[in-house]
């Protein structure tokens, strides 16, 4: 893999403004309040709503969406609050993303997974083309997985997901997408739900 790593500012100096990626994986910093959002109110990346100047979470989401190719897929980690916050238009942005049929799956993770923060996290999976023929047609549905009770404590302040926990989450998502080798998907009360 060829690459170049350089210090930069993703929001204010996008080094790849025309990039359209087939796959995006990201772990952006959670809940950044000093990201200069007030200087980007009219940014073309904010197609689903202007993110609040005091929290960059939905700026990251929309930056990722902006760079997805027509059949692109993204997976990223954000603070758990991104699934429910309604402050400063965040709820409207989230609703617009769902109505645009971009949100494929949301996974609520247990707290204490990260050594750098105690903030609970979640996984977002987005897909531009949810009827692409490779998997079942998932248009109009979102898979919700509640993995908050998974993973043992490895010490007083940290939790880790086991290989079995990770496989359970992944297999649930793959089965829901219609991947034959993952088996048949079924809702499991308290763990997963496919919702229209």
Predicted regions and their residues:
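Short, conserved SAM-binding/catalytic segment
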Residues: 1-2
């Amino acid at each position: 893999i060829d690459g170049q790593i350089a210090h930069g500012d993703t929001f204010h100096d996008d080094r790849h403004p025309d990039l359209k990626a087939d796959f995006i994986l990201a772990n952006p910093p959670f809940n950044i309040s000093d990201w200069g959002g007030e200087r980007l109110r009219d940014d073309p990346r904010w197609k689903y709503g202007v993110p609040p100047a005091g929290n960059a979470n939905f700026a990251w989401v929309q930056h990722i969406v902006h760079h997805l190719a027509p059949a692109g897929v993204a997976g990223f980690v954000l603070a758990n609050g991104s699934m429910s916050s309604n402050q400063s238009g965040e709820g409207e942005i989230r609703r617009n993303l769902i109505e645009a049929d971009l949100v494929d799956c949301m996974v609520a993770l247990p707290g204490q997974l990260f050594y750098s923060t105690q903030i609970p996290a979640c996984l977002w999976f987005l897909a531009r083309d949810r009827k692409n023929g490779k998997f079942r047609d998932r248009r109009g549905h979102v898979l919700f997985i509640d993995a908050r009770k998974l993973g043992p404590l490895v010490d007083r302040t940290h939790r880790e997901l086991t290989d079995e926990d990770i496989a359970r989450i992944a297999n649930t998502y793959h089965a829901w997408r219609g991947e034959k080798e993952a088996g048949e998907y079924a809702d499991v009360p308290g763990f997963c739900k496919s919702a229209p």
